[in-house]
């Protein structure tokens, strides 16, 4: 009887935990999302609007958040037509964390100078794998109050 239970248990299919990918998939997702993250920041550095916009999900569900609140949609996004770029952008502590298969969270600390004004804060991205490759589905930027020392970790 013990033998039958052991055999039955050994032959029973094991269900994977929801939201957890195989290690190779998590690693690949993380590497690919980080590559897109770096592409996004590099496009800002090079003021390459086409490359910058190509990193984003171009749908009505693109989420952009900051101190003024959540805004949705690609079509009404001011970045599509703006000619403003920061004079300098220093991005540090770039980190990515796999959430589930095809979804990766990313964050970085920033210091940006534009027109003799420097501010710093934290920016976040949520990367999703699409049939067209990896895209940014959520982007945020939260600046520190003026005069506050950098505190990002």
Where in this protein do the model-derived segments appear?
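Bacterial N-terminal signal peptides
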Residues: 1-8
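Short beta-strand edge/turn micro-motifs at domain boundaries
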Residues: 12-18, 120-153
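Short, well-ordered beta-strand segments in beta-rich or mixed alpha/beta enzyme
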Residues: 56, 62-65, 103-113, 126
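Post-signal/leader-peptide non-cytosolic segments of secretory proteins
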Residues: 23-31, 44, 53, 71, ...
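Short, low-complexity N-terminal intrinsically disordered segments enriched in polar/charged residues
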Residues: 11-55, 147-153
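A short gly/proline-enriched turn/hairpin at secondary-structure junctions
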Residues: 55-71, 82-85
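Surface-exposed, charged secondary-structure patches
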Residues: 75-120
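Hydrophobic pocket/interface hotspot
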Residues: 40, 52-53, 60, 77, ...
């Amino acid at each position: 009887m013990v033998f039958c239970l052991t055999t039955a248990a050994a032959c029973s299919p094991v269900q994977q935990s929801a939201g957890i990918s195989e290690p190779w998939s998590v690693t690949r997702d993380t590497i690919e999302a980080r590559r897109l993250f770096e592409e996004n920041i590099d496009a800002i550095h090079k003021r390459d609007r086409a490359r910058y916009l190509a990193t984003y999900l171009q749908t009505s569900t693109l989420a952009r958040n900051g101190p003024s609140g959540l805004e949705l949609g690609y079509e009404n996004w001011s970045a599509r037509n703006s000619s403003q770029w920061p004079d300098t952008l220093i991005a540090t502590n770039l980190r990515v964390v796999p959430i589930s298969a095809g979804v990766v969270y990313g964050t970085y600390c920033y210091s940006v100078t534009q027109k003799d004004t420097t501010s710093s804060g934290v920016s976040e991205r949520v990367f999703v794998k699409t049939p067209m490759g990896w895209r940014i589905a959520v982007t945020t930027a939260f600046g520190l109050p003026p005069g506050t020392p950098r505190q990002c970790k």
